[in-house]
């Protein structure tokens, strides 16, 4: 299988998580979960109290991550998760907190 065929299997999603998601270890737990799923990208707090993330990897692993984000770590109270696929040539090297 060529490098291009492998790249075609990589998906990238932008995600916003709303609710009680700051000050509860959400970003740290998201990094741990992404590493466990071998995903790449980043997660960050926004000034409006939400969390945003860019998640990159195989579709099945992204689905698992999106399912996890719907509840997050125990102290979080997620009320909404929105996401959209992003077309990009950029390939992240790892998953990290911003």
UniProtKB/Swiss-Prot annotation:
Domain of life assignment: Bacteria
Active site: 27, 45
GO MF annotation terms: acylphosphatase activity
EC class name: hydrolase
Stored InterPro entries: Acylphosphatase, Acylphosphatase-like_dom, Acylphosphatase-like_dom_sf, Acylphosphatase_CS
Keywords on record: Hydrolase
Residues annotated as domain Acylphosphatase-like: 12-98
EC number per UniProt: 3.6.1.7
Reactions catalysed according to its record: an acyl phosphate + H2O = a carboxylate + phosphate + H(+)
Family: Belongs to the acylphosphatase family.
Protein name: Acylphosphatase
Species in which this protein is naturally found: Burkholderia cenocepacia (strain HI2424)
Biological classification of the source: Bacteria, Pseudomonadati, Pseudomonadota, Betaproteobacteria, Burkholderiales
Gene giving rise to this polypeptide: acyP
């Amino acid at each position: 299988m060529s490098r291009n065929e492998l790249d075609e299997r990589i998906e990238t999603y932008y995600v916003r998580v709303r609710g009680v998601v700051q000050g509860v270890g959400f970003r740290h737990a998201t990094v741990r979960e992404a590493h466990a799923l071998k995903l790449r990208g980043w997660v960050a707090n926004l000034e409006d109290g939400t969390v945003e993330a860019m998640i990159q990897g195989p579709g099945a692993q992204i689905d698992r991550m999106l399912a996890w984000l719907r509840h997050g770590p125990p102290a979080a109270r997620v009320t909404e998760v929105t996401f959209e696929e992003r077309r990009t040539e950029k390939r992240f090297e790892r998953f990290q907190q911003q």
